Amino acid sequence: MASETFYKVGDGEEAMLKKETLNVLNALDQMSKPFPNPKSMNRTVTTKSLPLSSRGSLVNFLEEDAINLPKHMPLEDSECSSDDTSISPMSSTLLNPIKLAVTQPNSRFFAGMLEGELNKLSLSSIAKSTEKGHLALCPQSKSQMAPGGLLDFDNPEVDTDTSSTPSESSVVLDVPEAPFVCEHTVSDSTAVISWTYAPGKQQVSFYQVLLQEVVRKNSGETPKAKNRPWIFNKILGTTVKLMELKPNTSYCLTVRAANTAGVGTWCKPYKFATVATDLNSFPENNPIQITVQRKEPQRKTVSLGLEDMRRLEDLEHLFPY
């Protein structure tokens, strides 16, 4: 109504009032429209998933609301962007964790250390160590702990204030039993001897082999060993190869095992003989080899009680010989 009234007036002063009134109305019209909240608008733009509009339809949002979206604001001004990868401050103790290493000695370790010093072992030291049981130490008081969380072995209370727990690392008490020679392969100058040792028995650190040459004076006399034997020490395996033997010669061999407790007994003498050399019958590049195998005899023990003995007596009366 105001604009139509001013158009009817035609003098110069009223034209000036018309222009100023239009400017005021335009300013009021701009202030009447709600100003969009940049942060609330930014929530729609920065979200990766496509949201529905306030009108309740995805189609309406695409057709009607797309033109009303404001320009994309920088992510640094947004408070709820899904691309936010900020990391909360971490504690200094997590950046520099304390690393602990726990080790326990085992029997193989001690066997390797004491392998070459069996003669220096004393029975008193072994008996004293066995009273403590196993080698796992459990500190019970703070006085035994050195700075840094390590066990103080210089503290005399460690020997008295420790508890033994089941462990695989135990002190060896008994010497190993005698091995059994099970196989040998001979030629005219070499011999490969193998022996067995029952698993589950005393632990073995190494073996010792003694070899002697047997000489026959007459056919009716028993063989006699020479006074100069060969001794092979610290054999880790259960097979040995003897080189540079005399052809067509008899030898006598015996083996024993050793561990940290000492050396065991020698096995029964094992006799073998090398093959005779006959260059006319067999070529030199194809020598003869003979292999002999044997099994350890099995012993079975039968125990009978009083009732079993009475049953046997009754059977004797019923079925006499």
Curated annotation (Swiss-Prot):
Residues 175-277 form the Fibronectin type-III domain. Pfam families: fn3. It comes from the Eukaryota. InterPro entries: FN3_dom (IPR003961), FN3_sf (IPR036116), Ig-like_fold (IPR013783). SUPFAM superfamilies: Fibronectin type III. Transmembrane segments: none annotated. PANTHER family: FIBRONECTIN TYPE III DOMAIN-CONTAINING PROTEIN 8. This is Fibronectin type III domain-containing protein 8.
